[in-house]
Amino acid sequence: MNEVFLTPKEIVVVGAGMVAHRFVESLISRADTPMHVTVIGDEARRPYDRVGLTGFFSGATPEDLELDPSVFDDFRVRFMADDRVLRIDRSARTVTTRSRKSIPYDTLVLATGSYAAKVAVDGADLPGCFVYRTLEDVHSLKEFVSARSRMLGRPLRGAVIGGGLLGLEAAGALQGMDVEATVVQYSDRLMSAQLDSAGGGMLKRLLEARGISVRTQSVSYTH
């Protein structure tokens, strides 16, 4: 009987977050499908649980937050950390990375996720202003709060711009470091993409009962 050897399909995944991890996990569960999967992430670590970032402030390690590492131990998967796709050539079906690697693909998956946008106001790049998205972000925030509070000899005050899930997580993290936290939200309620007015109002009262100030329908500026 003649054996048929199928050419492995080349799959490139741009992004190494939770969605990319789940996608690759699903792919490699199909043991009968020949494939090579290349995952390109711009952080110098494997995918981790961003929703659990606040745990870092209470003693969780990067390893505690890491998603199932066995996904990237599969022989069909190549993980490229600390790199970034700079160019996609759809005609040649290749991607070019910051490290000047050209990687061919049969299927290209963009799983870059969201990004933490800095507020477009003067002073947003000054020391003490942070975004809250990566382990490096929260590590820098923790070090700054510790050093600054020692220097001043008192607890700090902090503002969180954005009342979504990560913003509220950030406010909780600040409070856990004895920072007087205020959440500033542009819309009329917290988590406006998930909650109606009643739910947003209830959440606001719960946070205020915990000592976190909330300002809705507010704009941001620095001085």
Write out the residue ranges for each language-model feature.
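A conserved beta-strand/loop element that lines the FAD pocket in flavoprotein oxidoreductases
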Residues: 76-84, 89, 211-218
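Glycine-rich dinucleotide-binding loop and its adjacent helix/turn
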Residues: 112-177
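Rossmann-like dinucleotide-binding cores of NAD(P)H-dependent redox enzymes
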Residues: 155-159, 166-218
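A structured beta-alpha segment of the ubiquitous adenosine-cofactor-binding alpha/beta core
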Residues: 85, 97-101
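Beta1-alpha1 glycine-rich phosphate/pyrophosphate-binding loop at the start
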Residues: 2-78, 171-194, 198
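Conserved small/polar residues in nucleotide/adenosyl-binding loops
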Residues: 221-223
